[in-house]
Design a protein with these regions (language model features):
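N-terminal, positively charged regions that mediate nucleic acid binding
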Residues: 2-46
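Glycine-rich, mobile lid/loop segments that gate access to catalytic sites or pores
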Residues: 12, 82-237, 367
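Conserved phosphate/anionic-ligand binding catalytic regions in large, soluble enzymes, centered on
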Residues: 16, 20-25, 123-138, 237-261, ...
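Conserved beta-ketoacyl condensing-enzyme motif
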Residues: 43-112
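A short glycine-rich, hydrophobically flanked beta-strand micro-motif that places a catalytic Asp/Glu
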Residues: 43-47, 172-178, 226-230, 297-307
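Glycine-rich anion/phosphate-binding loop at the beta-strand->alpha-helix junction
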Residues: 155, 201-292
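Internal helix-turn-beta structural module
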Residues: 299, 303-390, 449
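Periodic, rod-like helical contexts
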Residues: 408, 420, 424, 431-441
Length: 452
């Protein structure tokens, strides 16, 4: 639902550093997935991790011709913990002495028969609902408070790993509240940062140093009225799994749209592309981005639903929150018919057989320009699409005011952005392509060289 132009509201989003216990588990799951993909690009994988104190559990299902061995899994787990920056059990977890327990089973034959069907089609590995969202309020296509919260956690991680703030430790979180008027962000009303630090550092130094870093990261969005909360409890020395247990998939809201859009509930990390709660969520994001970047909407949320063993979605819907330049139902038909949402097609288009996933577990699954699903991957409506329309013009026989396919009422060119003047037989005519199936209507009243 669109906000009223004068309505004031506050939207809050959060982000975690790489050393947060839940993010630690996400990175373990995706590091193992990446390692499996290097071994076997066709692996079917669902790996989760849990962490508490100085112990890590790895469990799940894998179907592969060349699965990782136990000692390889243990070494990858230790490497992830070490790369994040943990050094001892006293500060969170020790990469060299932590206990690693592994329980990996083959994928259920009942599930496998729906994924790899007898007819050779790759089916969805489960039923499920996924969502993709995009907005024009930031270059990343993400809500501003989420982008700002991510700036804070990335600034913390950079300051720690470069040694700029030597007493910072890996665990941390940030939260940013932004006031909107209508759909336009105005200012940061509050921000919260909780950063793990060494015991010998005084809280006053922690607060002043982190506040300066945060203000620089947030820039002009911070005002004199912004409420600031840095390590509100006064001490954050014990962190990581020693302070809080971690589990794969518990930060899917922060990793996607910050609560501004829906989430189907399925975790991403540790899952290969046959699992549509990951692959289709990425495809839905790609579709939403295209709608926004094509200026069909200022905001868009795509919903896709699947049935286990079936390759095509059972439902596709679109919500543009009142910002669409054409009805949402028509955009949904366009998405369903123009974008191949079968698992095999999504895996190929989004490059989901390549080892790119641990990066998403560290930095979030959307908003990074180098990720395949952040690319539009659709034809330019003014070039290739129109060429196909022109080529098919001679076969069209629609009555004025209707498309021959019967899908939709005729729309104005300002909505379709695909109307052009083409030669049509012996006459000139304006042709409008149905955005659903590309059938063509030739205006009966057009004259050569003129407009309908």
């Amino acid at each position: 639902m669109a906000s009223k132009p004068t309505e004031s509201r506050i939207v809050t989003c959060e982000s975690m550093t790489t050393g947060h216990p839940d993010k630690l588990c996400d990175q373990i799951s995706d590091a193992l997935l990446d390692a499996q993909l290097i071994r076997d690009p066709n692996v079917r994988c669902g790996i989760e991790a849990a962490a508490s104190a100085n112990e890590i559990w790895v469990f799940g299902q894998v179907a592969s011709r060349n699965p990782l061995k136990y000692n390889e899994i243990v070494e990858i787990v230790r490497r992830v913990v070490r790369d994040i920056g943990y050094e001892s059990a006293e500060e969170g977890i020790d990469p060299d002495t932590c206990t690693v327990r592994v329980t990996i089973d083959p994928q259920s034959a009942d599930i496998a028969m729906g994924v790899v069907r007898d007819d050779g089609v790759l089916g969805a590995s489960d039923q499920g609902i996924v969502y993709g969202y995009a907005t024009n309020e930031t270059p990343e296509g993400l809500p501003l408070p989420l982008v700002l919260a991510q700036r804070l956690t990335r600034a913390l991680t950079k300051a720690r790993t470069t040694g700029a703030i030597p007493w910072l430790r890996p665990d941390g979180k940030a939260q940013v509240s932004v006031r909107y008027v209508g759909d336009t962000p105005q200012e940061v009303t509050a921000f919260v940062v909780s950063a793990q630090h060494r015991a010998e550092v005084h809280i006053d130094e922690v607060r002043s140093t982190i506040e300066a870093l945060a203000r620089e990261a947030l820039g002009n969005w911070v005002t004199s009225n912004t409420a600031v909360h840095i390590n509100p409890t006064g001490r954050f020395v014990v962190g990581g799994p020693l302070a809080d247990s971690g589990l794969t998939g518990r930060k899917v809201i922060a990793d996607t749209y910050g609560g501004v859009a829906h989430h189907g509930g399925g975790a991403f990390s540790g899952k290969d592309g046959t699992k549509v709660d990951r692959s289709a969520a990425y495809a839905a994001r790609q579709a939403a981005l295209h709608l926004v970047r094509s200026k069909l909407a200022a905001r868009a949320e795509i919903t896709i639903a699947y049935a286990i063993g079936i390759d095509k979605p059972v439902a596709v819907s679109v919500d543009t929150f009142g910002t669409g330049t054409m009805p949402d139902e028509q955009i949904a038909e366009l998405v369903a018919l123009k974008l191949d949402l079968r698992p095999a097609a999504m895996i190929e288009r989004l490059e989901l057989r390549t080892p790119i996933f641990v990066r998403t577990a560290r930095d979030g699954h959307v908003g990074h320009a180098d990720l395949p699903w952040e690319h539009e991957n659709t034809v330019d409506p003014k070039t290739e699409f129109l060429t196909r329309v022109a080529e098919r013009a001679g076969a069209s026989q629609g009555a004025p005011g209707r498309f021959p396919c019967g899908h939709l009422q005729r729309l104005g060119k300002e909505h379709l952005s695909v109307g052009e003047h083409f030669p049509y037989g012996a006459q000139g005519a304006e042709l409008l392509a149905c955005v659903v199936c590309e059938s063509i209507e030739a205006s009966a009243t057009a004259t050569k060289g003129g407009r309908a």
